[in-house]
Amino acid sequence: MRLRLIAVGSRMPKWVEEGWHEYAKRLPSELAMELVEIPLNTRGKNADVARFIRQEGEAMLAKVGQNERIVTLEVHGKPWSTEQLAVELDRWRLDSRTVNFMVGGPEGLAPEVCARADQRWSLSPLTLPHPLVRILIGEQLYRAWTVLSGHPYHK
């Protein structure tokens, strides 16, 4: 099974890349975690934001295979505790499909991406900076794996 974070935005600060890679390398090879960056369209004051969101959404969906699972990160998604995420991770492993976690740009996800979601996940009711979300997803997936494997990290 593969875990893939598909996120709008590239050229993240070094601390974001290091944080993401730290958790990705901690996971076992049978639970490989990959990052796919979708370039953020430059927003000017007269930008057609709706068109940019649609283009970013199309680019995100183009990275997803036909039978792969999509989990969107949305403020109105379902909040999961660590234990609930571990249960979901275990279900996903049994399903053995690639799981794609979709993180939109500053204005959020395209409606087309949300419509394709198998699940909607909310990390918090707070608005979080997108670079930090990458690290949080990586850490939470690693933490969920440690719960399933009895590793002491979660204690």
Curated annotation (Swiss-Prot):
S-adenosyl-L-methionine binds at residues 73, 104, 123-128. Keywords: Cytoplasm, Methyltransferase, rRNA processing, S-adenosyl-L-methionine, Transferase. It is an enzyme of class 2 (transferase). Its EC number is 2.1.1.177. Its main location: cytoplasm. One of its GO terms (molecular function) is rRNA (pseudouridine-N3-)-methyltransferase activity. It comes from the Bacteria. GO terms for cellular component: cytoplasm. SUPFAM superfamilies: alpha/beta knot. Signal peptide: none annotated. It is found in: Cytoplasm. It catalyses: pseudouridine(1915) in 23S rRNA + S-adenosyl-L-methionine = N(3)-methylpseudouridine(1915) in 23S rRNA + S-adenosyl-L-homocysteine + H(+). InterPro entries: Alpha/beta_knot_MTases, RlmH-like, tRNA_m1G_MTases_N. Belongs to the RNA methyltransferase RlmH family. Specifically methylates the pseudouridine at position 1915 (m3Psi1915) in 23S rRNA. Homodimer. This is Ribosomal RNA large subunit methyltransferase H. It comes from Pseudomonas fluorescens (strain Pf0-1). The lineage of its organism: Bacteria, Pseudomonadati, Pseudomonadota, Gammaproteobacteria, Pseudomonadales.
